[in-house]
Design a protein with these regions (language model features):
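Phosphate/diphosphate ligand-binding glycine-rich loop within oxidoreductases
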Residues: 2-124
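Glycine-rich Rossmann-fold phosphate-binding loop(s) that bind the pyrophosphate
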Residues: 13, 136-137
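N-terminal Rossmann-fold NAD(P) dinucleotide-binding loop
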Residues: 140-141, 235
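Conserved S-adenosyl-L-methionine
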Residues: 149-154, 245-247
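NAD(P)-binding Rossmann-fold cofactor-contacting core
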Residues: 152-176
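Rossmann-like adenosine-cofactor binding region
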Residues: 179-250
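Adenosine-phosphate binding glycine-rich loop
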Residues: 225, 229-292
Length: 292
């Protein structure tokens, strides 16, 4: 008998305003399924990010079918899973965990497929020869993997933690071939951006708790496209500034919707309507929260 009820959740920090519960529960309702989606906020629980393994085990023992994982646990969770799919392994980041009938936890990454689908839909003609990416965390790893999968020539990764940028560039080169990725520092951004085709922004800057621009506005120029990972608000200060200069832009709503749709498929085994889920996100565009 096909299962028709599901208990899932989201582990992360500061996730109170997350749209994930509404997205998954609403799509389940429309498909005649029952989905209960719980928020497991490490800040409210008073536990550190390193407790993610304990939380995953507790969710499994309590009968959860699966979990989404968001900042700052996407990389920390790896050590606590029984198995990774090839994409999660290549990325070194997990945003979806599925518990099988035997209680084994398998990690997936729907951020990369979500970003790729959104980019192909929203910036289909964008030149991809040279890309600068800001941010090398879990969402950044997925975005870089996605644009290289879409055919980007080279991605230069910039992160406040230089060693994290270097580590991501190394993993990307190992997966896609030498020379496809590089890493740089913020003080080298002027040179990197002067010859770039586009910017992928994958840091928390622009969210409610982290307002502002992730780079000096003077470094933007009309020849760039700008793709955002932050989805609440859909119109970040970066996108507004870039659009005013004449840049082509892509908000983070598509990545959020398409990654959620891919996670829904993993949780339920049913085919979601991703465009309908994107409309749900667009309809809730007024609030502010983190990329998931």
């Amino acid at each position: 008998v096909a299962k028709d009820s599901f208990l899932v959740g989201l582990i992360g920090s500061g996730i109170g305003p997350s749209l994930s519960p509404a997205l998954h529960e609403r799509e389940a309702d429309r498909q005649g399924l029952r989905c209960v989606y719980r928020l497991i906020d490490i800040d409210r629980l008073g536990v550190p990010p390193e407790a993610v393994g304990d939380l995953v085990r507790a969710a499994r023992d309590l009968g959860f079918d699966g979990l989404n994982i968001t900042h700052p646990c996407k990389q920390l969770v790896l050590a606590h899973l029984d198995e990774l799919d090839s994409q999660a392994e290549a990325l070194g980041a997990v945003n979806t965990v599925i518990f099988d009938g035997a209680g084994r936890a398998r990690g997936h990454n729907t951020d990369v497929t979500g970003f790729a689908a959104s980019f192909a839909r929203g910036l289909p003609d964008a030149p991809l020869e040279r890309i600068v990416q800001l941010g090398a965390g879990g969402a950044g790893a997925a975005a870089a993997h996605a644009v290289l999968t879409l055919g980007a020539g080279r991605v230069t990764v910039v992160d406040a933690l230089a060693e994290r940028a270097a580590a991501l560039a190394g993993r990307l080169n190992a997966h896609f071939g030498a020379g496809r990725a590089g890493h740089s520092t913020a003080d080298a951004l002027p040179g990197a951006l002067s010859g770039a085709d586009g910017i992928v922004h994958a840091t928390p800057t622009g969210m409610a708790a982290h307002p502002g621009l992730p780079l000096p506005a003077g470094l933007l120029h009309p020849g760039l496209w700008v793709a955002e990972v932050v989805y609440r608000p859909l119109e970040t200060e970066l996108l507004a500034t870039a659009r005013a200069l004449g840049c082509a832009t892509l908000d983070g709503g598509g990545m959020a919707a398409f990654q959620a749709a891919d996670a829904f498929r993993l949780f339920t085994g049913r085919e979601p309507d991703a465009v309908r889920m994107l409309a749900d996100i667009t309809g809730a565009a007024g609030a502010v929260a983190a990329p998931e």
